[in-house]
Amino acid sequence: MKINILTLFPRYFEVFCRESIIGKAIKQKKITINVVNFRDFSKNKHKKVDDYVYGGGPGLLLQIQPVVDALEKVGGLKIALSPQGQKFDQSVARKLAKEDEITILCGHYEGFDQRIIDNFIDFELSLGDFILTGGEIAAMAIIDAIIRLKPDIINPESLKNETFNDFLLDFPQYSRPANFRGLEVPKVLISGNHREIGEWRQEQRELITKKKRPDLWEKFLKIKNKK
């Protein structure tokens, strides 16, 4: 899979592309990440890529020319990060993980010239209902969520029980020591009875989801009732 990242701040991604799962996937040539600087496509001698908004108002806007020129040099599904976009979730991550190539545009300032969105983008994505200075942090989160779903990146058994796979949150997990300052690990987990451990974990997933995320609980019940 190839992921193109269009940004004003390519250095944001230097450590991101070297460390953890992303770095490992790149070294193993499972994925390619191509970071593109909008400024490289500016026709301004000072590499300026922003300007004032027509009609007045505070802030600056990314200009259409350098953004479109950058877009035309890359392929795949074109995705702009925007507060107006579809909310990113695990189901979107799964769909994007099936693509051979995607391009992510990181906004900045007051966003993009609307003509970019209307004519050169396939769709918009939002990480949630909050404001970030730019799209770089959101891009990293989205890329991480996508890459870990690709084959041979993470143990498939580890993915099966992860939160959101079946609309249930994960079960509580514990490690050594079994007793820390009187705080004990549930006895069932050290019983060696794998059937009881499995039942306990499923029960905990349902209890936690029902309590903490009633919206996910409703989705889980709908799927469960259809079976």
From Swiss-Prot:
Disulfide bridge positions per record: none
Entry keyword annotation includes Metal-binding: no
SUPFAM superfamilies the UniProt entry points to: alpha/beta knot
Pfam families the record matches: tRNA_m1G_MT (PF01746)
Gene Ontology cellular component annotations, sorted alphabetically: cytosol
Positions in coiled-coil regions: none
Binding locations of S-adenosyl-L-methionine: 107, 127-132
InterPro entries: Alpha/beta_knot_MTases, tRNA_m1G_MeTrfase_C_sf, tRNA_m1G_MeTrfase_TrmD, tRNA_m1G_MTases_N, tRNA_MeTrfase_TRMD/TRM10
A single BP term in Gene Ontology: tRNA N1-guanine methylation
Subcellular location: Cytoplasm
EC number: 2.1.1.228
Gene3D superfamilies assigned to the protein according to its UniProt record, in alphabetical order: 3.40.1280.10, tRNA(m1g37)methyltransferase, domain 2 (1.10.1270.20)
CDD domains: TrmD-like
Record's catalysed reaction(s): guanosine(37) in tRNA + S-adenosyl-L-methionine = N(1)-methylguanosine(37) in tRNA + S-adenosyl-L-homocysteine + H(+)
Enzyme class per UniProt: transferase
GO molecular function, one term: tRNA (guanine(37)-N1)-methyltransferase activity
Swiss-Prot/TrEMBL keywords: Cytoplasm, Methyltransferase, S-adenosyl-L-methionine, Transferase, tRNA processing
Self-association state and partner proteins as the record states: Homodimer.
Family: Belongs to the RNA methyltransferase TrmD family.
Protein function: Specifically methylates guanosine-37 in various tRNAs.
Name of the protein: tRNA (guanine-N(1)-)-methyltransferase
